[in-house]
């Protein structure tokens, strides 16, 4: 009897400990950082000069981290390139790099800074996490020596990686991620030999890590959610906004909803390069977001999130659209270009209506009602089903309702930032050939519409009430990863030409060297 009671007592005690040591909610912080850039140079600076630049940025990050901790935050995410900027060649970034060990070494740099050589940046980040009892996510550069025994070893005898690091609330290094999908112009870094799947567990859920351009590809982004069941993504980024479908807050919030996870996106603040847009996004709606092209200051965001995301019901993205007939119309289809992709469009000529437009295997259906039909603004329903080939190769299926740049239909698909037309109702669906579809709603002045729309299990994106502001776009952004035929960047700098970049008309997202 005593033994039986003791076992029951122990079992109850264990359950209590588990309950006490986990949290149902947590407070997340992201910091949009106005990075201090070093002077452009064709020759490497000294380690001391590089550290001086990095410490200027770390001073600003310290203020944000301390403020977040004082407001109760459990974790803070800071941007890609936030400690030294992006204007580098392979040689000139070298003084800014540190050797970042595998987290399995069980290391608190704040307590033992010389264990892995000279690591002042890791030491300072570790101390900021430890002194403020907060998880800190940051982006720095890693260097790894290699030799002739490695057939892929670069000629300069080292690999250089765009790297995210995570320090826990004790200052311990708990995660290291080498960015896999480098964006054009990141010639200063190597591509890891295979995608790294990086997670870390906390008392407020399981987290996954990836960086900027990674979000457009299956590995590691989708794998982290589908196979490793993370609750929250931490996402350092240097994202350049591209309308109509790839502004930062628009696409990142859509990815959170489409994948059913929390998403903590920290962007650089550099309006002259269209870099702004950070947010804390839950699966059902944005919790906090920031988009500011007018000022030069950074911004700290905080919000409470559920620790363990309950993945929403599975959406059959083609169920509704494939079960209805195409809406008849007398309007003439026309083509227009959105970020180099040729869409098939139909103009919305009435204040209310139903339209269908198709391209290849994708048919998009729209029902809508405007508050009024203005003569100075034109809206169109568009479809794109094809391989995007500019600044990356990725297969897209997109259904979009968008405002055209002018009152002439030939401008449909161009970037638009303001609108005057409000919509009382919309319902958008498509015959998608993928389960990976990301729902976007973007209002005038590049603002989100939290709580004003939702997705049904049969694949409709629809409004729940009249929108609170004039509409820029309503979009279902689909990805068919297996059709990508992605051209991987070489991990061997012998195939790279330092300082030479592919030039295109419009720079898109992530970490450019100019």
UniProtKB/Swiss-Prot annotation:
Catalytic-site annotation from UniProt: 80, 179, 212
Covalent lipid sites (GPI-anchor amidated aspartate): 492
Residue ranges of the propeptide: 493-514
Domain CN hydrolase: 40-307
Keywords for the protein's UniProt record, in alphabetical order: Cell membrane, Glycoprotein, GPI-anchor, Hydrolase, Lipoprotein, Membrane, Signal
Glycan-modified residues: 39, 87, 147, 316, 354
Signal sequence extent: 1-22
Molecular functions per Gene Ontology: pantetheine hydrolase activity
InterPro entries in the record: Biotinidase-like_euk, Biotinidase/VNN, C-N_Hydrolase, C-N_Hydrolase_sf, Vanin_C
Catalytic activity: (R)-pantetheine + H2O = cysteamine + (R)-pantothenate
GO biological process, one term: pantothenate metabolic process
Membrane topology: Lipid-anchor; GPI-anchor
The protein's Enzyme Commission number: 3.5.1.92
EC class: hydrolase
Main location, first listed in the record: membrane
Entry-linked Gene3D superfamilies: Carbon-nitrogen hydrolase
Coiled coil location: none
Any Pfam family hit: CN_hydrolase
Cellular localization per UniProt: Cell membrane
Cellular compartments per GO CC: plasma membrane; side of membrane
Membership in a protein family: Belongs to the carbon-nitrogen hydrolase superfamily. BTD/VNN family.
PANTHER family noted in UniProt: BIOTINIDASE-RELATED, PANTETHEINASE
Function: Amidohydrolase that hydrolyzes specifically one of the carboamide linkages in D-pantetheine thus recycling pantothenic acid (vitamin B5) and releasing cysteamine.
Subunit description: Monomer.
Protein name: Pantetheinase
């Amino acid at each position: 009897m005593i033994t039986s009671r003791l076992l029951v007592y122990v079992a109850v005690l264990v359950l209590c400990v588990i309950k006490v040591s986990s949290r149902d909610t947590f407070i997340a912080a992201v910091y949009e950082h106005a990075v201090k850039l070093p002077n452009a140079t064709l020759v490497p600076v000294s380690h001391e000069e590089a550290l001086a630049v990095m410490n200027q940025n770390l001073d600003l990050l310290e203020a944000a981290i301390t403020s977040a901790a004082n407001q109760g935050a459990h974790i803070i995410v800071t941007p890609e390139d936030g400690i030294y900027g992006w204007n580098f060649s392979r040689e000139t970034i070298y003084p800014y790099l540190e050797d970042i060990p595998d987290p399995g070494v069980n290391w608190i740099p704040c307590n033992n800074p010389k264990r892995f050589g000279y690591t002042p940046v890791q030491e300072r980040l570790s101390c900021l996490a430890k002194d403020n009892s907060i998880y800190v996510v940051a982006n720095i550069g890693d260097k790894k020596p290699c030799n002739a025994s490695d057939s892929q070893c670069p000629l300069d005898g080292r690999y250089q990686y765009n790297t995210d690091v995570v320090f826990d609330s004790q200052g311990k290094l708990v995660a290291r991620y080498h960015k896999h999908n480098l964006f054009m112009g990141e010639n200063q870094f190597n591509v890891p030999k295979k995608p790294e799947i990086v997670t870390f567990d906390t008392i407020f859920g399981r987290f996954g890590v990836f960086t900027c351009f990674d979000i457009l590809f299956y590995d590691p982004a989708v794998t982290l959610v589908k196979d490793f069941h993370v609750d929250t993504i931490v996402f350092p980024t240097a994202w350049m906004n591209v309308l109509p479908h790839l502004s930062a807050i628009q696409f990142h919030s859509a990815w959170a909803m489409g994948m059913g996870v929390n998403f903590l996106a920290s962007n650089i603040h550099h309006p002259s390069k269209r870099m702004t847009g950070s947010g804390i996004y839950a699966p059902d709606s944005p919790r906090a977001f920031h988009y500011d092209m007018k000022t030069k200051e950074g911004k700290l965001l905080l919000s409470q999130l559920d620790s363990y995301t309950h993945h929403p019901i599975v959406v059959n993205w083609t169920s509704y659209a494939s079960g209805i007939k195409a809406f008849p119309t007398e309007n003439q289809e026309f083509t227009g270009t959105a970020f180099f992709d040729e869409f098939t469009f139909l103009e919305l000529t009435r204040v209310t209506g139903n339209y269908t437009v198709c391209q290849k295997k994708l048919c998009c259906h729209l029902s809508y009602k405007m508050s009024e039909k203005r003569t100075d603004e034109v809206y169109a329903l568009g479809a794109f089903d094809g391989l995007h080939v500019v600044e990356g190769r990725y297969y897209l299926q997109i259904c979009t309702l968008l405002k055209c740049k002018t009152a002439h239909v030939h401008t449909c698909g161009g970037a638009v930032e303001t609108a005057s037309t409000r919509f009382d109702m919309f319902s958008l669906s498509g015959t998608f050939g993928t389960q990976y579809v990301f729902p976007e709603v973007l209002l005038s002045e590049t603002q989100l519409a939290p709580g004003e729309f939702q997705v049904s299990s049969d694949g409709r994106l629809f409004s729940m009430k009249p929108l609170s502001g004039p509409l820029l776009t309503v979009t279902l952004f689909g990805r068919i990863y297996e059709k990508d035929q992605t051209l991987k960047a070489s991990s061997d700098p012998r195939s790279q030409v330092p300082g030479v970049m592919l030039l295109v008309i419009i720079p898109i997202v992530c970490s450019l060297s100019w």
